[in-house]
């Protein structure tokens, strides 16, 4: 299984999964034309489309792809809207011949139905986990997102993480602000700046790397927790409240409008 990044829209990535005998699948096609061009350039045949969630920038290329390749579309059962032909429940597995076996993990938070797709040492995580960051909580609760991030953290350290956007440099700026003495973040900033200057993606990343640099996976680290408490003006916070404080802190840092805190959804 060979995985290629296809940049689309302003900062999205479509992941092209190349298997044997010219078979391929794509994850989260936000556009069709660049994906079709890359499939043709590599002389491949599209066998399936995989979706992590329903946002348009991850699925608005489905129609154009299916007009050329009438293939099945695998996606979250809780968001099985227009395009999903094969809804996936939590822990459901499916096989794509000559490509691989995939398992769906329900990872809500960014959306209520969001899934991540796990296969052969790779995790396609959509907008749940970014390198040095995580998705905004448009529908899910802090409890849900933290549980999703903890679940992804249980993957082996060598797992490669394929996220949906090129957000790494911006995320690292906040990570360094929150943890100024974290040398792993400083080194990663250098590496990402070099990669981006060369026109290369900053992702995939590894779970091992994310545990060192991603503040949203590190809320229980004493030094970061102290910074979160100081920012909140509090002596004690639950893990979910600490996560939410950190998420809002990053939104303030990025000058983004604050989202409401949603109640736990079951």
Could you describe each region identified by the protein language model?
Residues 133-159:
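Active-site-adjacent loop/tail segments of enzyme domains
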Residues 26, 73-75, 125, 162:
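Structural detector of well-ordered beta-strand residues that form the stable sheet scaffold
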Residues 29-31, 54, 78-79, 110-111, ...:
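Active-site metal-binding loops of divalent metal-dependent hydrolases
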Residues 9, 23-24, 31-105, 191:
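Active-site HxH/HxHxD metal-binding segment of metal-dependent hydrolases
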Residues 150-160, 169-266:
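Accessory terminal helices/loops
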Residues 17, 28, 53, 65, ...:
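Divalent metal-coordination and catalytic microenvironments
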């Amino acid at each position: 299984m060979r995985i290629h990044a296809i940049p689309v829209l302003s900062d999205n990535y479509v992941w092209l999964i190349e298997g044997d005998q010219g078979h391929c699948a794509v994850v989260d096609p936000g556009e069709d034309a660049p994906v079709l061009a890359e499939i043709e350039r590599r002389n491949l045949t599209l066998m399936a489309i995989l979706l992590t969630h329903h946002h348009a920038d991850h699925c608005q290329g489905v129609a154009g792809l299916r007009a050329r390749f009438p293939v099945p579309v695998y996606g979250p059962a809780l968001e099985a809207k227009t395009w999903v032909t094969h809804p996936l429940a939590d822990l459901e597995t499916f096989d794509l011949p000559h490509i691989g076996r995939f398992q769906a993990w329900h990872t809500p938070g960014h959306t209520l139905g969001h899934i991540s797709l796990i296969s052969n040492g790779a995790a396609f995580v959509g907008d749940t986990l970014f390198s040095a960051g995580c998705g905004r909580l448009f529908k899910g609760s802090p409890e849900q997102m933290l549980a999703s991030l903890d679940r992804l953290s249980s993957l082996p350290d060598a797992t490669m993480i394929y996220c949906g956007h090129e957000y790494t440099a911006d995320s690292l700026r906040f990570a360094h602000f929150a943890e100024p003495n974290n040398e792993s973040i400083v080194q990663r900033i250098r590496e990402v700046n070099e990669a981006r200057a060369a026109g290369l993606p900053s992702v995939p990343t590894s779970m091992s790397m994310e545990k060192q640099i991603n503040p949203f996976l590190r809320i229980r680290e004493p030094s970061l927790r102290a910074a979160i408490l100081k920012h909140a003006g509090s002596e004690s916070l639950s893990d979910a409240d600490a996560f939410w404080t950190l998420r809002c802190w990053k939104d303030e840092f990025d000058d983004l409008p604050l989202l409401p805190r949603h109640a736990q959804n079951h």
